[in-house]
Amino acid sequence: AHLGVCVANAIYAITCPGTAARAAGETTSWFIDFGMRNFFQNAELGISNALSGVVYHRELVFFVLCAALFFGVWSKYRTWIYRLLGLFPVTCVFLLGVLDQPLTQMIPKLSFFVNGLTDKGTVTVVTAWSLKRYLPFLLLCAVFAVCIIDLYLALGHTVQAWMAGVVLCGGFASRAMLGFSPTVWQSGDRTAFFFLMGCLFVTLCVWQTLSDAPKRFRLGLIALVGVCAVSTTLSLIGA
């Protein structure tokens, strides 16, 4: 019954005349070209907006999630292909996100990934015919897809794994769907909160599985969280 009420409310919110009037006003105020975009352009913008902020920028909550998945996979598997899958997201996020500024100063060509997102998306009408321009978007998709695979590997074929996957994908979708709204650049911070809360929940789920893992994996994750906490505190106080 509760689900039915939610669905009915969503249908009403989408179809009521006030929604169309508000969308027209927001398009004029925030995204004048929004009405000229197609489904695929909006989907690409939403995905790029949701993931660029956590992969190509210094978002420690998502980095800790990737690190937890790394420890979770490496504590359970010795097969090299599984370990490579566990290593891929945390490496990408560490190099392109956590170390974005110092690394791009050392290797300027990496700024192609970090600065790939524009206000029209990663792939625009102007750059659509350049295969190189698709690389930042494809890397974002690959990182998130491998995170889902790592989550399944770390938690196993369990109900908890499916629940954690739904929470993570739901948090991601709550921000990616803004690609279909003219306020995509004004409402991003609010919806990012739900995505990051989903990341924290999934991190806790993976942490529980490390209780049976060798002690070095738990200590490694604790040390990493401590370093991230100190780093965040220092940045907040301007040290």
PLM segments and residue spans:
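Polar low-complexity intrinsically disordered regions
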Residues: 3-7, 11, 212-216, 223
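Alpha-helical transmembrane segments of multi-pass membrane proteins
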Residues: 141-145, 193-204
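Hydrophobic alpha-helical segments
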Residues: 179, 197-204, 209, 213, ...
